[in-house]
């Protein structure tokens, strides 16, 4: 089953969030950024309400611009430092994050007109900012 959400229309969609689901692979295919999630994703609490009985999920983001920004949360090493910051990192690291030994989990996303900001976690918080005109959820 395929669900399509358009981010280039006057009314923005409410896109479901596969919260705490592990992203296994991230690829780029003809202006589509593709997140492939773990098998048996329907066992996750956040997915049970969205799509009960789902075996797998692939999310495809159609990019308006193939450039995107990737940020990683950093906190100073100082013991008493209470504040951290997001530091921009090389966007090519995105593809390596899913294949690292630390599970890359999808946390949430923020939707705006032709824009999407995705928060993920792999040992630290990762923020991805994209220019997107449509999002497709492929459920199996």
Predicted regions and their residues:
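Surface-exposed, interaction-prone regions used to assemble/regulate multi-protein complexes
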Residues: 1-140
